[in-house]
């Protein structure tokens, strides 16, 4: 793995199927003058782990894939296979999920960029339904 795995992602465990780990790469306790810093965390997914469908409001999300193999899917579109070096730019308001392939660990760096005209600090995740085992297992043939 390219970056630290971090601690078990217990704070968000209810939004994941399987186990994930979170390693913040930028400090969280910034002063008001430093809030322009781009927040980044390394997220590690154990094999078969994925997050629920979700939507980012007030910000776009950028995923930089750094190790292993994963999946990214937008609602109503086919899943995209991810590998180290891939970058996914997710527009604000798009329903999506991402996670590891069934037989591979997967790491990505996640960051978000507030969209123009959003209220500072208004970015929020809307967590939705899990990706069903049936949906996920259909991807196994695409690996």
Q: What does each model-found stretch correspond to?
A:
Residues 1-38, 124-143:
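A short, N-terminal "cap"/entry segment at the start of jelly-roll beta-barrel domains
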Residues 28, 39-57:
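Conserved short histidine dyad/triad with adjacent acidic residue
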Residues 50, 57-84, 94:
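A short beta-strand-loop-beta hairpin characteristic of the jelly-roll/cupin
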Residues 73, 83, 87-88, 116, ...:
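A beta-strand edge to alpha-helix "cap/lid" segment located at domain peripheries
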Residues 89, 103-124:
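A short hydrophobic beta-strand segment most commonly corresponding to one strand
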Residues 22-24, 40-44, 62, 79, ...:
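Conserved hydrophobic/aromatic beta-strand scaffold that supports enzyme active sites
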Residues 45-48, 82-103, 113:
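Conserved metal-binding segment of the jelly-roll/cupin
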